[in-house]
Amino acid sequence: MSKVVLVNPANAAVGYSVITPRWLFVIAGATPTEFAGDPIIVDEPVVAFNPQDVGPGDIVGVGIHTGNCRPGYRVVREAKKRGATVIVGGVHATVFPEEPLEMGADAVVKGNADIIWKEILEDAHLGRLKKVYDGGRVPGELMAKARWDLLDSNKYLMGCIQTVAGCPENCSFCSVWVTDGRTPRLHLNEQIIAEANELHAMGFRYVFFSDDNFTPATHARIARETNAATRANLERVREDRLKLFDEYDRLGPPTLYGFTQMTAECNSDDEYMDAMYSKMRLRGALIGVESFTEEGLRNVNKTWNPVGQKMAEAIQKIQSHGIMVLASIIGGLESDTLSTLKTMRQFANISGTAFAQFPLYSVYPGTKDYHEMIRDWKNRDQANYVPKHAVQIVREKYWLDYDHTDVAVKHPSIASDDLMKEAQESWSNFYSIKEILARTRSGPMSSLPLAAKIFYAVACRVFASLYPGGIAADNVRKTRLGIIPRLSMRAAMRVARRDYDWGIRPQRREVIEEIIDMAA
């Protein structure tokens, strides 16, 4: 009997992973069992793909993004040598469908495969496989439910649930709004709750809500929308989100705590933040700070973001509602100088954010920046051509030989070595023992009991060692973890299975005002 094997490619297998790769189990859920039984799941951050396990008649599905396309193409080659039919999907394949075909894939899936996957399998079985399939953007009510029964829960720190797809923003460095659209698509409440209960029953006590923007329709976002129809839709989305929070509170697991990604604008919506903490049990969120300067925010088309002191106040307000912030601050934007990078490092410390990351600016396929920089690169030798960007892309299709420890773009005034040095110093400073202890003595972490403070300190050190370039999918990691990160990860997995809320607690208003004054 033919097999369906789904592979999440990576450079290094380390035996376990932080977050479950949702796409694997969603496509497993979209795979009809009558075709080939249960699909076989291969998550390469946990275990490497073995080509000997596939042969003629088998179908291998490979999901790639830009960061893991090279190991993905390695899986394509290995599976093809064994006579298997290989189908490639994912964000990178959506943007560049011709590239996987050039690398040997039999077919490519653009967009979401939740609905179209069954048709693709039937075509492959009948020998009529097309080169390109377009799954489009699947409506929220038709999104496939993940097959968590195929998951080895002992290999992961957190489960993964998607509640909304798409993002109404159009940041120039981000491809989400290009590939997933700017109209939020809401997953069915009953499926979200069912998956949460299933993951909790499997032993998980922490879950990652894998939404690119968990808060697409806050008061502030709605207020700045100029299109009447879009504004009305966002108002409906906000009400629907609050209904989800209510239903999740009543029917979801009471000891499953969440992390997600959202915008700083959620600080404008107290009702939303209170519900996220108390009803969704949200305990942490990545916030795209991007830059503490107005010019830096203009560089990334995110001028609606709070800036400077207002961003510090937004972070403090979010944390006052019990949601720890992971502030993501990009280094190497067009307007950056060595001086602004040093200021960025200082501001991260005084902002009071629980966690911070300092990724270097990179230009990803599908983004507005990428298309503009490629145009600049192709016209660089033409007389009288005025480039759109002072930052220059190093070469076309850099990801095929680009090492993610290097810089993919050339900054107009800062050498690549200096950029990497400043980024490393930012990481080292923020996650130094001195600064970690300082955060446990003042601000929201000071309210934690001693055991939770110790857990927070260990979490800081583990995070810095696991994600030295910023939080990303585990399949982007280039090498195996060292012994200390491995031991720390194992300890964290044991602790994270306990019915204990390690998060910060909502704080009194006078405490928040005192913290904001300190930041000022």
Each PLM stretch: what is its role?
Residues 6, 62, 209-211, 287, ...:
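Conserved beta-strand positions
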Residues 58, 103-107, 126-128, 225-227, ...:
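Short, hinge-like loop/turn segments at secondary-structure boundaries
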Residues 144-326, 331-333, 337-346:
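Radical SAM [4Fe-4S] cluster-binding motif and immediate context
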Residues 2-9, 36-38, 53-55, 101, ...:
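Radical SAM enzyme core and accessory elements
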Residues 1-206:
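Acidic, low-complexity intrinsically disordered segments
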Residues 26, 74, 116-119, 123, ...:
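Alpha-helical elements of Rossmann-like donor-binding domains used by nucleotide-donor carbohydrate transfer enzymes
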Residues 14, 97-99, 169, 206, ...:
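Flexible glycine/acidic-rich beta-alpha junction loops that bind and position SAM and/or redox cofactors
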Residues 99-119, 276-284, 343-358:
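Structural recognition of alpha->loop->beta junctions
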